[in-house]
Amino acid sequence: MKFLFIGDASNARYTLAKGLRELGHEALVIGTRGKWRRMNVDICVERGAGRVGAVVYLLRWLLLLPKLRGYDIVDFNGQFFMDFKPGLKRLFFDYLRKHNRYVISTLLGLGHYYVKGCVEAKLFRSSDFNIGDTPRTNAFASQMADEWLNQPEVVKLSRHMAETSHLLVGTGYEYWACLHHYFPEKTCFVPLPMETPEEPANIGETQGPVRIFIGIQKERDEEKGTDILWRVLQRLNNDYPDKMTLVRAENVPYDEYCRMMAGSDILVDQLYTCYAMNALIAMSMGIVAATVAIPEAYALLSEKESFPMIDLPPDEEGIYRQLEHYVLHPERLAEAKRQSIAFVRKRHHYLEVARQYMSLMGRLEKNNP
């Protein structure tokens, strides 16, 4: 079988493509390298600055199009698959839908139905747009709510892609829940894929201060809640300077980021949405992830035995107490580290995820005889 992925986020599609190749299939990932993040893609198509950059970008896609026909599945990363205005994106989407067997729209980040599910349906205890019943009113939430809910061309393209895609895929609990809320018959869940390295050396009792790591994308500080998390960590570090070591990585390339995180005891990730690739990377390295890990996320994976993540509440005092517990009792980290590795290998191993993804073909053929 032949798979084409257009657009990626945090190497999720690239890792899935690797799994599909190892299972004997063809897979191609086209997208950007994510500026400073330097993500992996098979074909890099990035838009340069100004009018010249836009023209070159358009020509590059036009030259690629004849080669992007005859795939069994074309998988689009929501509306982030190209850096064009919605009208032109629709033309490319419709062309690829016409000249390939099936198209899937995968939600890997923000999108109309995700924002709609958070803002209007209020599906979650916390999200990028709410904390309980209270709307978040920061600049990011206001701007994104307006863009995804009130811009006619964005809404129109979102509806068109959702209604004409053969399947919709959510890669995390919130993404799946929002798509399923609006399109229950055609929504599927496929976990994020993760390569699992050899058994890390730091599994076992924590020796010395607890090493806590946080990665920050400055332009997404408010969105992810890392502004609040950093404030809590600084307070914790001031209170227990001899019991913990605090490491911060800000806007560094992916490979360097992983090197900086290696050897940590705890990763403090994000505050409003469920765990994603960042937490999985850490867990695969034997690092305990402190993030949002609600019961519904485990249930979607059919996980009933292992719950290794530290579930962060959306309030500063609750976050402080959760992390303080492990700073004062580092001996309790060893089992959580072992469970973290086992959880990723059981639920997110890239070959197993690739097999789950391949199983979508059966549903596609059943729904489209």
Predicted regions and their residues:
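Membrane-proximal helix-turn-helix segments that form the acceptor-binding/catalytic region
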Residues: 62-70, 91-102, 128-167
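A charged, aromatic-enriched C-terminal amphipathic alpha-helix characteristic of glycosyltransferases
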Residues: 328-362
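A short, active-site helix/loop in glycosyltransferases that binds the activated sugar's phosphate group
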Residues: 114-115, 145-187, 231
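Conserved donor-binding/catalytic core segment of Leloir-type glycosyltransferases
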Residues: 188-224, 230
